[in-house]
Structure formats: structure tokens, C-alpha cells
UniProtKB/Swiss-Prot annotation:
Residues 5-104, 160-223 form a coiled coil. GO terms for molecular function: identical protein binding. This is FGFR1 oncogene partner 2. The record marks 132-133 as: Breakpoint for translocation to form FGFR1OP2-FGFR1. The lineage of its organism: Eukaryota, Metazoa, Chordata, Craniata, Vertebrata. Expressed in bone marrow, spleen and thymus. Residues 235-253 have a biased composition (Polar residues). Keywords: Chromosomal rearrangement, Coiled coil, Cytoplasm, Phosphoprotein. It is linked to A chromosomal aberration involving FGFR1OP2 may be a cause of stem cell myeloproliferative disorder (MPD). Insertion ins(12;8)(p11;p11p22) with FGFR1. MPD is characterized by myeloid hyperplasia, eosinophilia and T-cell or B-cell lymphoblastic lymphoma. In general it progresses to acute myeloid leukemia. The fusion protein FGFR1OP2-FGFR1 may exhibit constitutive kinase activity and be responsible for the transforming activity. It is found in: Cytoplasm.
Length: 253
């Protein structure tokens, strides 16, 4: 049972990370779609202004205006096609999110059902509750199991079935507590990962700044060395010229 819980915890953590990536991608696609819509509206407005200018400035060649309008129309069609592709990609991401959450709920349901395989009545009730939460947010998964247990215990039962459900109440509550604890551990792990990521980003930024400073120092040192070499070369040239002139003077003397 502990191995199953650990495996479910690892899978749930992976699913949460994948959901976060899909959420970020979906938000990015929404922003891009909004920007493209604004660009399309701006293009349409620009085309209308061009038409108005064409009516006002009739002395200008119509061929130039027609070519400009045709070019703008091509750009608008390209933007519309790109907008359509982005919308399709956004729908695919949303479908993937729904599929991932459905798989996650099924896995958590199988975990609870495995511990209740000897009680078909509880399984049927859990199945009914599972079918009612297809559109519930992922952060409400532990609330689903609490609602399921509450619904089972509050349902009208009689005789042996009622007593049997009351006898299994403590065991079901224990599993609900385990699932709630798993959710808390998942949230804690995500927070730790985010904190670690922030620390790594800060460390990378610090190293980049240090690297930039060292590069600047190296550049200054290199320039100073080159200038020093140039000065030495000029001094050597001047000294050679002076020696040559002195030698010539001595020879003439």
C-alpha cells in the first residue's frame, strides 16, 4: 500500500508539473491570440484609412495605392491564418489538460477503490461521485473524496447495509486523510521546487554579472597592454632614428 501511495504521489507530482507547463503555454497562446487580433483590427483600420486617402488624393497614381492595398490584404490574410493556427493549438492544449486531469482522477479513484474491493456498495457510490466531478478543478481533488464519503454515509440505508457502511466509516476516513496528506506533500514539494528554481535563477544572474565584470576588466587590461606595446614600439622607433642620425653625423665629421 505504501508503494502504491508513493507511486501515486510521484505520478501526481509529474502531472501537476505538466499541468503548470500546459497552463503557461495556454496563457502564452491566449496573449499571442489577443495581440494578433489587435494587429488584425489595426490592419483593417489602416486599410480603411488608405481607402479614404485614395478618395481624397485622386491626383496620385492609383496603381501605387492598389499595390499597397493588395500588400496589406496579404498581410491580413497571413495574420488571420496565424490566428487560426494559434486558436487550434490552444484548443489542443485545453484538451490535453482535460485528459491529464481525467487520468489523475482515475488514478486516485483506483487507489481508493483498491482498498474497498470487498465492498461493492461503496464502489458503486464512489463511481457515482466520480462521474459528478469531471469539471472540478484539480485543487479540489481531496474535497471530492470528502464529499464522496459524506454522501455515502448520509445516503438512506437500511439494515445490514447501513451498519456495514457505518463500520467502514473509520477506514474510509483514514484513506481520505492519507489522500489529503498526499495533496499537502505535493503542494509542499511544488513550493520547494519553486524556491529552488528561484535560488538557481538568482545564482545564475549573479554569475552572469560577475562574468560580465571580469570580461570588462579583461578588456581594459588587454587595451592597456596593447597601448603599452604601441608606446614601446614608438619609443624604440624614435630611439633607432636618433641613433641613426647620430651615426650619420659622426661619419660626416
Amino acid at each position: 500500500m505504501s508503494c502504491t501511495i508513493e507511486k501515486a504521489l510521484a505520478d501526481a507530482k509529474a502531472l501537476v508539473e505538466r499541468l503548470r507547463d500546459h497552463d503557461d503555454a495556454a496563457e502564452s497562446l491566449i496573449e499571442q491570440t489577443t495581440a494578433l487580433n489587435k494587429r488584425v483590427e489595426a490592419m483593417k483600420q489602416y486599410q480603411e484609412e488608405i481607402q479614404e486617402l485614395n478618395e481624397v488624393a485622386r491626383h496620385r497614381p492609383r496603381s501605387t495605392l492598389v499595390m499597397g492595398i493588395q500588400q496589406e490584404n496579404r498581410q491580413i490574410r497571413e495574420l488571420q491564418q496565424e490566428n487560426k493556427e494559434l486558436r487550434t493549438s490552444l484548443e489542443e492544449h485545453q484538451s490535453a489538460l482535460e485528459l491529464i486531469m481525467s487520468k489523475y482522477r482515475e488514478q486516485m479513484f483506483r487507489l481508493l477503490m483498491a482498498s474497498k474491493k470487498d465492498d461493492p456498495g461503496i464502489i458503486m457510490k464512489l463511481k457515482e461521485q466520480h462521474s459528478k466531478i469531471d469539471m472540478v478543478h484539480r485543487n479540489k481533488s481531496e474535497g471530492f473524496f470528502l464529499d464522496a464519503s459524506r454522501h455515502i454515509l448520509e445516503a438512506p440505508q437500511h439494515g445490514l447495509e447501513r451498519r456495514h457502511l457505518e463500520a467502514n466509516q473509520n477506514e474510509l476516513q483514514a484513506h481520505v486523510d492519507q489522500i489529503t496528506e498526499m495533496a499537502a506533500v505535493m503542494r509542499k514539494a511544488i513550493e520547494i521546487d519553486e524556491q529552488q528554481g528561484c535560488k538557481e535563477q538568482e545564482r545564475i544572474f549573479q554569475l552572469e554579472q560577475e562574468n560580465k565584470g571580469l570580461r570588462e576588466i579583461l578588456q581594459i587590461t588587454r587595451e592597456s597592454f596593447l597601448n603599452l606595446r604601441k608606446d614601446d614600439a614608438s619609443e624604440s622607433t624614435s630611439l633607432s632614428a636618433l641613433v641613426t642620425n647620430s651615426d650619420l653625423s659622426l661619419r660626416k665629421s
